[in-house]
Regions:
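Charged, solvent-exposed interaction patches on well-folded alpha/beta domains
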Residues: 1-252
Length: 252
């Protein structure tokens, strides 16, 4: 396998191929590829060797198993709901017929007792229905949390592939392959990776932002190098920010 980047994040010392296969850096030798550092953490643990796609798929499969296991906790609650619904239907069918020779006072007393009984049972059944639904909702919330974990796993995998694609893009260009010394990656406010580049020329840092629209950003940076820094000097700015569309923002 041919690596495209070396990962030197906290606890990591591994190589990655363009397809997202990770393997540990050999102790006896080093492969000369771009280096990524920073506070970013790849989707798989530092000790992992193998395909990130396989790792992500396995974690999602485990999560699906937990969701199915949690779903089984609902079964007795569903049965209790059906029983409660049947009780409510039976309650509606409860009536009293006046006996042929029954005195009116006695019949009215029985009607009153039935009304009180039905009112009491109706409250009990409604309470039972509410409690059962609350318990089901709590279980569903745990399932939703698992699905949210799956979304984060997929997003983390997609973000990692974007970083690898960025490295491949840099390596295909003779100028950028020579100019970019280090790629620093951190997590942005939304959890997505944010890139900073350490160039060989000058004393500035390039704030690149997300790996999205990488070709456009690199083209914009190259234009600024040729038309800007070449005239005013490579040591003029401390940071050059190309993360914003159609803008280059510099700080001294």
């Amino acid at each position: 396998r041919r690596p495209v980047v070396r990962l030197l994040f906290d606890g990591y010392n591994a190589y990655a191929t363009d397809e997202g296969y990770l393997f540990a850096a050999p102790q006896s030798s080093a492969l000369y590829v771009p280096v990524m550092t920073g506070s970013y953490a790849p989707p798989a643990p530092a000790s992992y060797t193998g395909s990130i796609a396989d790792y992500t798929a396995a974690r999602i499969a485990e999560s699906e198993g937990r969701i199915a296991e949690i779903e089984r906790e609902k079964y007795p609650l569903y049965r209790a709901e059906r029983e409660n619904d049947e009780n409510i239907k039976a309650l509606r069918r409860m009536t009293i017929k006046k006996g042929l020779f029954e005195r009116r006072e006695n019949f009215e007393r029985r009607v009153k007792e039935l009304r009180e009984k039905k009112a009491r049972l109706r409250r009990e059944y409604r309470y039972t229905a509410r409690v059962l639904q609350e318990r089901i909702d709590k279980i569903s919330a745990r399932q939703a949390a698992e699905r949210e974990k799956q979304k984060k796993l997929r997003k983390s995998y997609e973000d990692f592939l974007k970083l690898l694609n960025f490295v491949v893009l840099v390596e295909k260009d003779d100028f950028w392959r020579s100019e970019i010394v280090q790629i620093v990656v951190a997590k942005g406010p939304d959890g997505a990776p944010e890139i900073e580049l350490v160039p060989r020329t000058g004393s500035h840092t390039v704030i690149f932002g997300s790996p999205d629209d990488a070709e456009e950003k690199l083209a914009k940076l190259l234009t600024f190098y040729r038309r800007g820094l070449r005239n005013i000097g490579w040591e003029e700015y401390r940071t050059i920010n190309v993360k914003y569309k159609e803008q280059v923002v510099c700080t001294k």
